[in-house]
Amino acid sequence: MRDRRGPLGTCLAQVQWAGGGDSDKLSYSLKKRMPTEGPWPADAPSWMNKPAVDGNSQSEALSLEMAGLSLPSGGPVLPYVKESARRNPASAATPSAAVGLFPAPTEYFARVSCSGVEALGRDWLGGGPRATHGHRGQCPKGEPRVSRLTRHQKLPEMGSFWDDPPSAFPSGLGSELEPSCLHSILSATLHACPEVLLKDETKRIFLDLLNPMFSKQTIEFKKMFKSTSDGLQITLGLLALQHFELANSLCHSLKYKQNNASRLILRVVLE
């Protein structure tokens, strides 16, 4: 039978085998698979892959990079990152240790978000062309469509998480979104919560975890950042999950439109 898992599914299976299923081992296995020097562009942040010689200067550099990220409503994420770091001084003192788990410059997350969130707001999140039959337009304004789907109806949505990352963005969305950028975000996502992605009982409700991130009502989104127990690591992980899922969702939204357009053209030709 043909393997339908796709590149991400195959990667997860390989990592699960190498790590023996334990989340700590999985994280270590993922980190070990990443190149030491990484395919970073010339303008990659200076704090990437460098020892924490000066905790304060590293924190300042990280703050500057995080300044470009925003909440679903457009508000800055940085205050919530700072609050998380304040409550967890150990992670704030050695930010490079936390960042080392996520081999993707935070500017990459901002690039992905800026390129995808607007289109998704119109289509996928607002009950557009990918809406499940019988659920189009039934969600309150500002809430993600998936919040109203049953668990069974959410299963097809999980398919959007198993695509090849570069395919999520056609060339027309900007040359700055290079494959190395998207692959870095993929790595960050896998580091963030491998136990969620690898367990059957949790991956089925993965979209439930993402609902606050996709909601325009940012109260729950802010609460999520304030309640993180592991500081900067979890905060960056949540951001990685948000933007990678945006990328994959956009990919499926565009594919849906392209398929519909192809069918329409074929019908016109046949008639």
Curated annotation (Swiss-Prot):
<dbReference type="GO" id="GO:0005634">
    <property type="term" value="C:nucleus"/>
</dbReference>
<dbReference type="GO" id="GO:0097677">
    <property type="term" value="F:STAT family protein binding"/>
</dbReference>
<dbReference type="InterPro" id="IPR029155">
    <property type="entry name" value="SIPAR"/>
</dbReference>
<protein>
    <recommendedName>
        <fullName>Putative protein FAM220BP</fullName>
    </recommendedName>
</protein>
<dbReference type="InterPro" id="IPR040355">
    <property type="entry name" value="FAM220A"/>
</dbReference>
<dbReference type="GO" id="GO:0000122">
    <property type="term" value="P:negative regulation of transcription by RNA polymerase II"/>
</dbReference>
<dbReference type="Pfam" id="PF15487">
    <property type="entry name" value="FAM220"/>
</dbReference>
